[in-house]
Curated annotation (Swiss-Prot):
CDD domains: TrmD-like. It comes from Pasteurella multocida (strain Pm70). S-adenosyl-L-methionine binds at residues 113, 133-138. Pfam families: tRNA_m1G_MT (PF01746). It comes from the Bacteria. Its main location: cytoplasm. Keywords: Cytoplasm, Methyltransferase, S-adenosyl-L-methionine, Transferase, tRNA processing. It is an enzyme of class 2 (transferase). The lineage of its organism: Bacteria, Pseudomonadati, Pseudomonadota, Gammaproteobacteria, Pasteurellales. This is tRNA (guanine-N(1)-)-methyltransferase.
């Protein structure tokens, strides 16, 4: 997968390209990340990248010319088929279904806004989709872009040591994750659930499913509303609700 980044702070993306799972994916050439800085496309000695908004009001907008030139340069280099995404609070909220959808694309260009945002006409003419990581305000689009890259990269074949990990993690099936345990067997008087040491894989699977359902129902019940539960899941959920009534 090739991801292009339009950002005034490309150095921030070292967190993605040099560390952790995504850093390893970059080293293995499973993930390519390239950056374009609008400052490199300015025409004045001060490298100005902000401008006043029409109608007044607080704050500034990203200047159209250098931003547009950076976007078009990224499109030209990344090539045809690249989806241009603007990270914006007005966008579609990123969830696991959206991550899987975006992971189907081999080329993405992520536009990171700063200041009060960008000219609406650039969104209309240069952007394919707007995506948000939540209902809150950040100082720029870089952190949302890194969140998106990290989530999407997990679905690139070969990035995770065990591909099943991407499909079994929290939200992969629309449910919260089950509890996990490692050594020691007893920690401060708290023991690992015996079923996890039983060696009975079917019982372990059922226990994990039940825990996921219970956590989801208790902590994020709205997630269950959009799921098509299996007969097994419906039966377990009925038992869980009865126990808590």
């Amino acid at each position: 997968m090739l991801v292009g980044i339009i950002s005034l702070f490309p150095e921030m993306f070292k967190a993605i390209t040099e560390f952790g799972v995504t850093g390893r994916a970059v080293k293995q050439n499973l993930l390519q990340v390239r950056c374009w800085n609008p400052r490199d496309f300015t025409h004045d000695k001060h490298k100005t990248v902000d401008d006043r908004p029409y109608g007044g009001g607080p704050g500034m907008l990203m200047m159209v010319q250098p931003l547009r030139d950076a976007i078009q340069a990224a499109k030209a280099e990344v090539g045809e088929g690249a989806k241009v995404i603007y990270l914006s609070p007005q966008g579609r909220k990123l969830d696991q279904a959206g991550v899987k959808e975006l992971a189907q694309h081999q080329k993405l260009i992520l536009l990171c806004g700063r200041y009060e945002g960008i000219d609406e006409r650039l969104i209309e003419t240069e952007v394919d989709e707007e995506w948000s990581v939540g209902d809150y305000v950040l100082t720029g689009g870089e952190l949302p872009a890194m969140t998106l890259i990290d989530a999407v990269a997990r679905f690139i074949p070969g990035v995770l040591g065990k591909q099943a990990s991407a499909d079994e993690d929290s939200f992969a099936e629309g449910l919260l994750d089950c509890p996990h345990y490692t050594r020691p067997e007893v920690l401060d008087g708290l023991a690992v659930p015996p079923v996890l040491m039983s060696g009975n894989h079917e019982e372990i699977r059922k226990w994990r499913l039940r825990q996921s359902l219970e956590r989801t129902w208790l902590r994020r019940p709205e997630l269950l509303e959009s799921l098509a539960l299996t007969d097994e899941q419906r039966k377990l959920l009925k038992q869980i609700k009865a126990e808590h009534s």
